[in-house]
Every structure is written in C-alpha cells, then in structure tokens.
C-alpha cells in the first residue's frame, strides 16, 4: 500500500497540465511565495544555483510583457487562447552560464580556465528547467493553473530592454500562473497521445520498440 505522501505526489503529477485560460483574480502573496520558494529546491550542478526569476504581477506589469512579445493586433484577434493574457502572474526563469563557469573555476572543481567545452550539455538551462518544473508542480498543489511557454528569439531583446534583464542572464521561457477558468480548449498537440513506457524506456541496452 502506498503511503499518503506518495499518493498525494502522484495526484499532483497526474493533474499537472498546461493551462491556457486564466481568471484575472490575483494570486495571494503567500501562495506565490510558496511557488517561488519551492523553485529554490531545484538541484543544480555544483550547487551553483545559477538561476533567477523575473516576477511580473498585476495587469500593469503583465501588459508590458505582452506588449513586447505579442504586439500584433491581427494575431491577437484570432488567438485561440485569449484568456492566457489574463494570467495575473508571469514568471520568467533565467539562467546564467557565467555563474556555472565561475563556480567550476573554484578550487573544489578546478576548471580554472572556465572552458565551455567542459560542459557536455548546458547545465545552466537544465537546472533552470528543474526549477521551472518545481514551480509547475507547486502550482498544481496550490490549486493554481500554470503554463510554461517559450519566448521567441526575436522578442528576447525587447524583454531584456523592457525589464532591464542583465546580459549575463538568459530567459529560458515564461510561466503564466493564476486560477484556471476551466474553459480552455485542449491543445491539438494532445491528439498525438502520450507515448507508452516501453516506447521510451530501454532497460540494459538500447532496443527498438
């Protein structure tokens, strides 16, 4: 028999979905702080914690984000998820490559020349993604809806300029948070279906499904 905590966690994982239709009702400060504090529990290489979060609350701040990322009136008029723009909170997770290069130049790591070739994959983005996932799961546990979405390359400069993001930090996307209306249409992508376990898990040796 599963322990109560395990059952509750499985329920959070099962209920986790991308919400695209939000009420404009504000998120209580203590609830938002819980989401952000849990993000700090994310693992990071060398305990670098090379992530940061730009938090935009309320219509005045969120409108500034949409004005530089979704300023085409024609696109807005035909947008399939207009109530996405009603989300009362946007969190932009940012990663710092330099923080990792500096951390691994310290004596206990010994990569003193700060060479990028030491890194087989960009752990600064991966670790920030871990933090983002903890926010998504905490949102479910707190009764909120959440959506992780990308910021197109052509909009990054505008986001940096609008909110004063330092060059050392790279936005990896954005998270919309708020109370779900319960009325969003499912993404057409879901028609693809979820892959079965045997299609993605290779035990002991790579094998074709």
Predicted regions, residues:
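C-terminal helix-cap and adjacent tail motif
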Residues: 4-5, 9-19, 172-209
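A short N-terminal beta-strand-loop micro-motif at the entrance of redox/enzyme domains
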Residues: 19-34
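Small-aliphatic-rich amphipathic alpha-helix that forms the alpha element of a beta-alpha
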Residues: 35, 39-40, 91, 111-161
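Glycine-rich phosphate/pyrophosphate-binding beta-alpha loops
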Residues: 40-47
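Glycine/small-residue-rich phosphate/adenosyl-binding loop
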Residues: 48-128
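A glycine-rich helix N-cap at a beta->alpha junction
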Residues: 74-77, 81-86, 163-187
């Amino acid at each position: 028999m599963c322990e109560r905590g395990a059952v509750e966690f499985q329920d959070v994982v099962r209920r986790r979905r991308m919400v695209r239709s939000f009420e404009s009702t504000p998120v209580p400060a203590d609830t938002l702080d819980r989401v952000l504090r849990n993000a700090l529990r994310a693992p990071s290489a060398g305990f670098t914690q090379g992530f940061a979060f730009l938090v935009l609350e309320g219509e005045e701040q969120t409108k500034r984000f949409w004005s530089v990322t979704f300023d085409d009136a024609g696109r807005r008029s035909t947008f399939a998820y207009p109530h996405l723009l009603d989300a009362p909170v946007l969190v932009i997770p940012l990663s710092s490559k330099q923080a990792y290069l500096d951390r691994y130049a310290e004596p206990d790591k010994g990569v003193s020349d700060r060479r990028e070739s030491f890194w087989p994959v960009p752990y600064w983005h991966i670790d920030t993604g871990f933090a983002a996932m903890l926010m998504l799961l905490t949102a479910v546990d707190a009764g909120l809806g959440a959506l992780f979405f990308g910021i197109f390359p052509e909009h990054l400069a505008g986001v940096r300029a609008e909110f004063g993001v330092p060059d050392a930090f790279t936005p990896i996307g954005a998270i919309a948070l708020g109370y779900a209306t319960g009325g969003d249409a499912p993404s057409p992508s879901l028609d693809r279906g979820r892959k079965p376990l045997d299609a993605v898990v290779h035990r002991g040796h790579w094998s074709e499904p």
